[in-house]
Swiss-Prot record:
PANTHER family: 54S RIBOSOMAL PROTEIN L1, MITOCHONDRIAL (PTHR36427), LARGE RIBOSOMAL SUBUNIT PROTEIN UL1M (PTHR36427:SF3)
Organism: Pseudomonas fluorescens (strain ATCC BAA-477 / NRRL B-23932 / Pf-5)
One GO molecular-function entry: rRNA binding
Family: Belongs to the universal ribosomal protein uL1 family.
UniProt keyword Hydrolase, yes or no: no
InterPro entries in alphabetical order: Ribosom_uL1_bac-type, Ribosomal_uL1, Ribosomal_uL1-like, Ribosomal_uL1/biogenesis, Ribosomal_uL1_3-a/b-sand, Ribosomal_uL1_CS
Cellular-component GO terms for this entry: cytosolic large ribosomal subunit
SS bonds (residue pairs): none
Annotated gene: rplA
Protein name per UniProt: Large ribosomal subunit protein uL1
Subunit structure: Part of the 50S ribosomal subunit.
Amino acid sequence: MAKLTKRQKAIAGKIEAGKAYNFVEAAALLTELSTVKFSESVDVAVNLGVDPRKSDQVVRSATVLPHGTGKTVRVAVFTQGPAAEAALAAGADRVGMDDLAAEMKGGDLNYDVVIASPDAMRVVGQLGQVLGPRGLMPNPKVGTVTPDVASAVKNAKAGQVRYRTDKNGIIHTSVGKVGFDAVKLKENVEALIADLKRIKPASSKGIYVKRVTLSTTMGPGLVIDQGSLDV
């Protein structure tokens, strides 16, 4: 068994095994334990009572967090005409059609979100092998294929997160940065869970939100006492 580093020992000494933490307490502890030289993301993992092997129990959506994620989001939009002007006015970093597709095929993929209007899907459809593996393929289920590209750009820039259950029925997403106030982090997590409950599959039985775990990029995961969340 590999020996624990000094940092790992220090972390282990401050975490109570088996404890479900009050959210504000957990946020404060994660901040205390963050010793890296960059601003770590604060991430949440939510274990859901679903069977992702069943297509009607795959949970997938997008929601705008009230306080954003603290990240600068680069957005590319496939559209044309007045919609292109609206997308640029909304803050899109790049707008185009065939020219943008050619750039992406050439390896220019420095974007966090790709949005498309329905009429642009004839162009975007050629990029499945380029965008798909990176999770960038526009999809109407998460609002990235829409005639209202300007609103989609604004949502992306405002801190919209997209999520989907993995093979174990868990969703993972960022909910802020270590420097965020604990109350803002809490409100972001509450907004996420409210959205998860809104789209609960009708066929899901028993406990739906089974476990909520908060962590940082390089830190430990702390189980959250759901009673400390207002949702």
